[in-house]
């Protein structure tokens, strides 16, 4: 809304109402409202809102610097400093600071005086003392944040005095006034500080060392005005023996004050700088930090020590760094990292990482200090295991010399661990452990070596793009050598042999090195491109490593393998190298690069497991030779040669065997290699993959591929990042596990099988424990018999316990095998994804539909575990996104057309038999995909089948014509299949099929609508559920462009007429709904009718709507009687939407005054009913209305008692008000004919509105004589009426159409015009 210009004159009405108010009063109020809103937004918690409101306030005040708004703004902001909401006070303080900064002409002393007068500490009540204290504090802070306080000497002195006064209220403000005072004095000039210093700093050293703020003020003065401080206090040595305990107490207080803020107190860093300046850092660190704060066993003090350590790194020299990183602080930090493992515990490690990263990034030109800090943190170990993770992000800040030195240190520590140089510790739980093996040096060496090898791999993993190639090669050769080789005799040709082990490398450590090496291969071999998979020479990293391994194998006198090669295995290695040379001739082909990658990887695996990889390597070489030496493949239009070489099948088996191994690298290699050979895939090779995915085959039969359990390797790989918390809690966890097993065993023992029960009864009967009726007279069992019975029972229960354990082990074994099988199937799905992505036009893709559906169907029924969920999600993603929604598909079916038609029928039937809709949706989408394939293939391959059908007696008249005749799609068969499915969906109550399925069918294959839409039309007048579903489907289908394009104009018009006739038949019972189902039935019919109107209007179809209009008007009275039923508003809106399309406007409901309603004598019924909210008769004034029915004073005529019905309530009168106007005119209420239609006998045929206009005038419709001069609105109405029910846009203008609708309402009988007539008659009767 825009404000009125003050120069504009006011209207007479406004002048009368406003009196003597100024012309711009409204604009001033508008600005004031906007102005006041700023202060509300300033106090909101959102920072963006506060800043925006402050900026708008300043901009607003800049236009009125001398106005009253400035005074109000200052008053409002000062008031806000002491509001009850504590979160709003800093907001007002910041806004006041920015205001004072923007308007420098505002005197600070005046503002400070207003604050002190507003919040006078001497006169304020006790309940308001705390807000007043904070108001004064935030007021001073606002003056300081404006930047003007240090320049105004008078205001500065007053502020200092006020802060000193506020410092006495420590219970409320704590140390905030003193902190503010230190912050202010740190900004003032030296001359000002010399002048103020005697007033703020006492000469007593005890007071100076009593609080952090006093000490910080002392350090500030010592830094800026040392001469003045010396005159005031004298010479002071803070690090003397007497003052060290006081410094410790001050630092402890500072640590407690920032416990919630989690930051380093400024006083601690100032003391550190002072100690460095006075060359007293060793004394400060040893006595104050390590011997003082650290010994308190107070975690805030410990965190202060950690933060001080991190902040001190950039300030220390190399010698000082060595002092700090070998002390108790870093050891205590390591203990904290090891013990802080619970989710809710505070972890300082991320904060320390930030300190170290900042230090490394800031000293790029000093690699020695970088190396010293990184080595120091890597030397903090828990029984040999460093506390820093193997993957440490701060390594990326190392300069190249520091990185090279760090890698050299790691390699040296791996070969010759120096345990004495480590800052090693043990946790409390480890110290309590009685196991002596936990404290053996061999165990510490193993833990250290395992961490080092994974740290080397992580460095290459994170920095292999930035690292020098020589350094990467050093790490890779180091890992390869110590994974598979052992030094016999050092040689200069192999640098790795020059450094012997100080501790022998154990087999467990060598397995960790091997695992880390293959992880390194995954990093270096993820791609076939120049970076990162290849070196600068263009060869892959794996090729260089194979060449290095061949060099080691050739130096058998100096180096030997961990697992010695046999003659056959060495021949396989040599043949592999020969095959690599042959592949170099085909290096231009991408397939050759994939084969080379596979061959190199399996060749390296020959070093790890020679017996398993030897045969595999030979098969790969055979497949490579056949693949590269075969002739070009023939086109897909020809039949596949059954004598095709089986190299593809062999290679697929090899890839499946590689996928069975627990290696992500193998998974990537298998995926890449299969992408290059999938174009040569044969049905038998595909069947090998499907056998793995088929649940019936893979679960019931013995798998051809042995799946390897990867839990051990995963545990081995993830162990290096974990601390010793498992060992700390080992005893407690074992006790809990044993208790859990015992409880579980007891529960299982409760359900004893029948065989064990019979055996128990036999033993008891044999011991005469269960006798007959005369058992009481028998003697008790003797000791020998009792012992024999006990022994028998013990042996029986022991056997039962073994059986239970065996069943439990068998169940665990089956679950583990099932988990491994599911994991293997998830990996094999990689090959399926590659096939459907890279070869979607391959005919073999069609063979994947039912196996994938089988997996989805099984997983949806039993998707309890995470692996089942992963398998389901991956299968569904491949099926939906890569297969059914693929842009390309098979265009060469050959003789598969008949089988695909049968498969379509089978899939649709399976969809109708599924227990739920999600499963049915996948089957239905599969059938749509096959329809797309059949529709997109030419009929050349289907000629033979078509001829056979014609010979069998198929009517050629029903065969498709046009474009459909050129495809393989058998339209009659497909139509029959989907017609059956549609009928089942409409008639079956719990059908898994849904409306979106058939909408997808109609949109993708609209040619089927010619046969399926009549089924929907047939069910429009059926039972409740089929009618609702049919109407819903027709609503969506009739508006589809694809469906309309499949019908000729006469056919489409005929279909619209059929739908209109069915809907008209449904609407004959409109308004008679008694149940929810009947109400929904009426809603669906009206919705379909409106969709039909929109479709006809859009396409300009001509339909006869006379019968429909009569039906709708005939049901208007019954519809109004249920006007207030539940859910009827939607029904009325749809009804009048349809009537509006037919030219009938919805009557407006007007509220009438009580004076215009004729009064009537109240009936006894109305007198008995007491209305809620009305006065009783005894309380009403007597001079209200005469009891004998005489007219009232306002001249309104009273109706006779016989002409008025009994008085009813307001709601009843509103529901029946449509009947009253007709009675007021003196005519009986009858069913009104259509608007503009003459009253005729039932035998008279219905005429279109156009003929009615010619034969009869509009004025004669109501039986009244026509007027001499016809109004213009009626002429326009004749043009606006539908021409034989044509639903479309009229050529008239909008105004003409509006007048036409009004004239139609005027000429409509009874109900539509009764309200206007009655109102006119009442007004005429009231005139004298």
UniProtKB/Swiss-Prot annotation:
Classification via Gene3D superfamilies: Leucine-rich Repeat Variant
Complex formation: Binds to and represses JUN and MYB via the leucine zipper regions present in these proteins. Also binds to and represses PPARGC1A: this interaction is abrogated when PPARGC1A is phosphorylated by MAPK1/ERK. Binds to and stimulates transcription by AHR. Binds to KPNA2. Interacts with CLOCK and CRY1. Component of the B-WICH complex, at least composed of SMARCA5/SNF2H, BAZ1B/WSTF, SF3B1, DEK, MYO1C, ERCC6, MYBBP1A and DDX21.
Region (Interaction with MYB): 1-582
Nuclear export signal 2, short sequence motif: residues: 263-281
Residues carrying Phosphothreonine: 1190, 1196, 1239, 1244, 1269
Pfam annotation, one family: DNA_pol_phi
Post-translational modification: Citrullinated by PADI4.
Organism: Homo sapiens
Modified-residue entries (N6-acetyllysine), positions: 71, 158
Phosphoserine PTM positions: 11, 775, 1159, 1163, 1186, 1207, 1232, 1241, 1248, 1267, 1290, 1303, 1308, 1310, 1314
SUPFAM superfamilies found in the cross-reference section: ARM repeat
Subcellular localization: Cytoplasm; Nucleus; Nucleus, Nucleolus
Record family assignment: Belongs to the MYBBP1A family.
Glycyl lysine isopeptide (Lys-Gly) (interchain with G-Cter in SUMO2) crosslink, residue number(s): 1148
Region (Required for nuclear and nucleolar localization): 1151-1328
Entry keyword annotation includes Acetylation: yes
GO cellular component, one term: B-WICH complex
Modified residue annotations for Citrulline: 1307
UniProt region (Disordered), positions on chain: 1-22, 698-753, 1146-1292, 1306-1328
Protein name, per record: Myb-binding protein 1A
